[in-house]
Amino acid sequence: MMRKYQKYIIASVMAICLMIAYLTTYEYVIYFHEQHHLFRFFGPYLRETLHEHGLFYLLTEFIVQFSYWTWLGAIIWTTLEVGAYFLTLNAWRRLTGLRDYICVSGIPSVMMFFSTVSVDIFPERAVKIFACVLGGWIVSLILSRFVPVIRRRYQALNAAPEGKRPWIWLLISLAALGIYAYKGYQDSTAPKEVGLKNGRTRTFSREERIKQRHSERVMIEAERALKQKDWDKLYEITQDYAAEGTRNHLMSYFRAMALYHQGKLLTNLMDYPQTFGVKTLFFPWESDRHCAEFGGYVYEDLGAVNAAQHWEFEALVGWGETATHLSNLARYCIVQGKEEQAKKFIAPLRHTLYYRGLARELDRQLASGEVDGLKNALADTPQDPARWDNVLNLGADLRYILLSDPQNKMAREYAAAYFLLANNLGAFYRNLKEFWPMPEEGYMPPLVEQGLVLVQSQIGEAQLQADGYRISPETEQRFREFVLELNKGQNARFTPAQRQTYWYYVQRVSPHGRELKF
């Protein structure tokens, strides 16, 4: 009796472990692949994909589309991997006439699993492995029926008695399966040589690769929160990541956006060292599809829809037609009144399984000419003469937005932060006088005040007051204490509060040096 149910016990343990892995540790991978591929029930697309990438790639895209719900994607991949175990076990028994005591039949399933848990590799290999297993099982079925020697061995195996202590063999099989899984994990995190942009290569150690996977997971979770406009979650993720002390441009960029939407950009930006300088606030264009994928987010929030559209189109070129890129491009075109272009981006979504509802919503927005939550800050700006977006200098774009939309709060705060991070006090103060007068009550945000202290050291207190600005006594006292500590030179011991100031950034952190432009 125990022998009869042994394979079902092993399969159940395997299924539970796979589901836990897919829905916890590797849930972000399932989400990532679904977001970067789009299967369509559309003849031209099917023929083109089949011709360019082959049948297995097309089948994999078909499977990946169900990961729109990550739990459903996890169920499908788990079913295929457990199915591969049963097929391999049956083929083994038919061809060898032996029992699988060391769970060799689980090896294809382990290989399939580790082919589906990397964001760098499309899980096409897992589908190929399953196809090979299925083909091997069919061959074993034919041989065990028409080759007498194989048929007799298989019949003898089925008629053999159960044997003693079947629990021991079950435990041995489960232990062997665990060893295969551990070996697969070791191989997936083994040191790897990677080519760099400068033509050189670098070998990443096992520890570095494990740390890299952690960063991948956090970045993808952060991007998901941003897409969902869940600013509380994005703030929590980026704060936790910053607290780890790891330098990452994308997470600094996301953190700045989260801080703004929390109303904390000019209060808490300096809580952690801004080692990327002005690049904390944006992605400069580097002809890289990853940069293109993320660079447009800040422009969308700022209301520079045309610039966001340029970034999104570059991402479309780099990644292909995905639901995110198509829907974003459609939204941007709708807001700018480009109806025919919007229709072209909406059309592919109508042929999908899960994004048809999104296509209908975009059609509704196209009819109304408005998109919920999206504002075109440059709608009233003359298009002649034409102006090129500055893909290397966010400051120029911020100025352009403010000239067209002086009440744009995000552009105003980002401009203040940008010029301060660039060590450009002169541009910071000129921009402040033009677009951000002193409030009648209270004071400016802490980061702005800290910049004004340095401006005051250049133009004098009388001129600063004549321009309508004032600095709180608390900030002036903090600055005096900072200068006293700074004057100690190598013996300076800055407090945590002093390290979280713009003055400390200029003296110790800024990648643009200590020199201030005025």
Residues covered by each model-derived region:
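Membrane-interfacial, low-structure loops and terminal tails that flank and connect transmembrane helices
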Residues: 1, 148-164, 194-196, 204-205
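Start-transfer (signal-anchor) and selected internal transmembrane alpha helices
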Residues: 1-18, 166-169
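Aromatic-anchored segments of alpha-helical transmembrane domains
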Residues: 17-22, 106-117, 155, 159, ...
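Membrane-interface coil-to-helix junctions
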Residues: 20-63, 67-72
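Transmembrane-helix motifs of polytopic, lipid-linked glycan transferases
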Residues: 78-96, 110-113, 136-144
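Membrane-interface helix caps and helix-loop-helix hairpins in membrane proteins
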Residues: 115-125
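Internal/C-terminal transmembrane anchor helices
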Residues: 163-184, 207
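Soluble catalytic regions of membrane-associated enzymes that act on cell-envelope
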Residues: 204-388, 403-424
